[in-house]
């Protein structure tokens, strides 16, 4: 979970009131944050958050903004945001190469002017950038942010798919390296190059003088990409693979810079062919969030309350959320810096926090029952212990993912997969029907760790099943992956034999026709005439799709079917 260290004096100055450490601790409670101590020598407060839904709070500026809104009714407003059909005047352009659509497609930015950066401000900005990129940005994979002295940049900026041999001086060095050499030699390249190393070309930011601004998401240029105390005019950009996540990160940054005292000047991003987007250009910061409908009866039913619409709207306003009614329906309008309203229940949570947890009377459960583990869970735990005993490391994955990862890279069709009809992002468009793609994706970013690799997961999968009322079936599967230069079919067959020996289950093997195995090196597992899974060596074609260059063998079985025949 995110942890912050913020200067107490800056924090209190931004709130506009003085508080003791105990009072600060109480101020943080509604926002799932804990006061973790005060260092008198540095003057810093330590704060730890208990969830990751509100990246806008991960700076003293964002926290102060929310505290002022919640406790003192000061609703922030930012007039530099463009909206659909209402683009603001822009002061620079970013031109996006069409080839970037398949690499790291999104980049948005703004200019911040009019304030001289001191040492505390610089430290604050660097910490904010790091928290946003590491946590919300999933260690720069999802989004990454760069900050530059704009006086050294000539617009327009070009965001191109560059040759790996392109050279520039990276930040922290005094000699040129090619992009490929940065990946292999620079500390940041070694840490983050796995994000883009599987592409033939790499992202590069160039200004109109053809000077390198940045190699996102790896490292800035040493000549342009270094902020210093005394700088006044900044260019801030965010690149990413997720449209809304990239825009939100930029919006949060713009609001923080504005609250710090900067003037925010919009920048236009122009997407060139063959981008398949609903728009060809966007002036940012841009308000993209959608309104969410809520129902008063649903709120009162879930909270056990009797709140009026007026009271609900006041509670939402304490959270920085505006609301309105139209045609007998009620809607919330998310703030510029938030995008965590995915469903009506998220609105209800904000109402609950706005009301204050102490305003709800605790109730004892109306029913009492003695709990115990289900037979499936007991069996799964036994299997889990066996896997750990054989030297495997357990993984935990999301059940949802993209068509590219679950289907295209696996070289299979989508007939068994469940597709979400209204996905928020293509990264969560399908529900998995197999755990193997998750294991391969982990392997694709683990090449820096010593071999062999042995990982597994016991988790849910969902398949299309027209014989059921719902049209789907959900199962618990066990899957594991082994990788290494010496890993072969015989090696994994030995592990499979050991597993079923200790489970006291007899199995039969038949040659598998599964398309992601090497021909002749895959087997289906049959028990009492029923196919419950299989194992084999992954084909080089599929390995290449995931950017894996070491042999891998995988195994997957349906634990529900396995248990019923044990």
From Swiss-Prot:
Cite the Pfam families for this sequence. B5, tRNA_synthFbeta
- Catalytic reaction(s) noted: tRNA(Phe) + L-phenylalanine + ATP = L-phenylalanyl-tRNA(Phe) + AMP + diphosphate + H(+)
Q: Name one GO cellular component term.
A: phenylalanine-tRNA ligase complex
Q: Name the coenzymes or cofactors required.
A: Mg(2+)
Q: Name one GO biological process term.
A: phenylalanyl-tRNA aminoacylation
The record's subunit annotation is: Tetramer of two alpha and two beta subunits.
Organism field = Borreliella burgdorferi (strain ZS7) (Borrelia burgdorferi)
Q: Where in the cell is it found?
A: Cytoplasm
Gene3D superfamilies (UniProt xref)? 3.30.56.10, Bira Bifunctional Protein, Domain 2, Phenylalanyl-trna Synthetase, Chain B, domain 3
Keywords, ordered alphabetically? Aminoacyl-tRNA synthetase, ATP-binding, Cytoplasm, Ligase, Magnesium, Metal-binding, Nucleotide-binding, Protein biosynthesis
The family note in this entry says:
Belongs to the phenylalanyl-tRNA synthetase beta subunit family. Type 2 subfamily.
Residues annotated as signal peptide: none
| UniProt lineage | Bacteria, Pseudomonadati, Spirochaetota, Spirochaetia, Spirochaetales
The protein's superkingdom reads Bacteria
Example of a GO MF term: RNA binding
Q: Protein name, please?
A: Phenylalanine--tRNA ligase beta subunit
Ranges for domain B5 come to 287-362
EC code(s) of this entry: 6.1.1.20
Query: Where along this sequence does the record place binding of Mg(2+)?
Result: 340, 346, 349-350
